[in-house]
Amino acid sequence: MTEKNAYAQSGVDIEAGYEVVARIKKHVARTERLGVMGALGGFGGMFDLSQLDVKEPVLISGTDGVGTKLMLAIKYDKHNTIGQDCVAMCVNDIIAAGAEPLYFLDYIATGKNEPAKLEQVVAGVAEGCVQAGAGLIGGETAEMPGMYGKDDYDLAGFAVGVAEKSQIIDGSKVKEGDVLLGLASSGIHSNGYSLVRRVFADYTGEEELPELEGKKLKDVLLEPTRIYVKAALPLIKEELVNGIAHITGGGFIENVPRMFGDDLAAEIEEDKVPVLPIFKALEKYGEIKHDEMFEIFNMGIGLMLAVSPEKVDRVKEVLDEPVYELGRIVKKADASVVIK
């Protein structure tokens, strides 16, 4: 028995791994940007910071996955957008700290290496990197039979960005009277899917629920997470925002307070929130308490900004998209987030 045959008999297909690398090269090439060095396949990804026009660079990093949204991608056999979700979860976090994404690495673990499927996953990662302006400089694909079922895989990512030291957003600039502005989400994004899957466990995904305005359920559930880099970065460069909150798991209640100090609170007017149809459907079919929805989901707002009142008009001008004036920063009395 040769070593190759022995490894194959244990469930690891080395040739399939080589095929994946060959397939993804064209997708990785799309993400080339200033500072990226070296070719795909080295032991480490390289990035030349000296190419950047940053006087006092501070590196800011983030890592995340996409949770059980992956299980729906597997269920519906649609793998070409889940990679964008992974990138979004990482780069949206670091943009909230004031960082411009520089590069990204991905990690895929699977029970059986299927090159065509994994190419779709990486194509989605590459698309996310293009939207974020980040180079895809490395990654790992691990075939792990016995750990995962043959159709299963997991996906995680790691993003590194840079900020001018003076432009870091850490909550210290947010003050009473700041206006809370919201940018629309594209859908559920990548949080709350354990509940989503329970609510729609008996659905095929082909349903066109009346709340979903003619769209199939599976398409709405797998709508990729919006990447906010190109919207937020000009605001950061122009120093127009005091705080940024990426609305992920925990919804408004957990994430909004992360952008300001313990002595402040966010007062949000519920009727200003552009609640998406999918959240109305989840609340109805899942029989979820209305208040709890704001503790779980983004409800239609994926990024929230704290802005000085005199800068609001300029922020809206720079964004050139619908901007939702949601409320104000106030002195904290009891709760950190008050939804009226």
From Swiss-Prot:
Gene3D superfamilies reported for this sequence: PurM-like C-terminal domain, PurM-like, N-terminal domain
Leader sequence segment: none
Alphabetical UniProt keywords: ATP-binding, Cytoplasm, Ligase, Nucleotide-binding, Purine biosynthesis
Alphabetized GO MF terms: ATP binding; phosphoribosylamine-glycine ligase activity; phosphoribosylformylglycinamidine cyclo-ligase activity
Primary location group: cytoplasm
EC number per UniProt: 6.3.3.1
Subcellular location: Cytoplasm
GO cellular component: cytosol
Record bears the keyword Ligase: yes
ATP-binding in keyword set: yes
Reaction equation(s) it catalyzes: 2-formamido-N(1)-(5-O-phospho-beta-D-ribosyl)acetamidine + ATP = 5-amino-1-(5-phospho-beta-D-ribosyl)imidazole + ADP + phosphate + H(+)
Disulfide-linked positions: none
Pathway: Purine metabolism; IMP biosynthesis via de novo pathway; 5-amino-1-(5-phospho-D-ribosyl)imidazole from N(2)-formyl-N(1)-(5-phospho-D-ribosyl)glycinamide: step 2/2
GO biological process assignments: 'de novo' IMP biosynthetic process; adenine biosynthetic process
InterPro entries, A to Z: PurM-like_C_dom (IPR010918), PurM-like_C_sf (IPR036676), PurM-like_N (IPR016188), PurM-like_N_sf (IPR036921), PurM_cligase (IPR004733)
Similarity annotation: Belongs to the AIR synthase family.
Protein name: Phosphoribosylformylglycinamidine cyclo-ligase
The encoding gene: purM
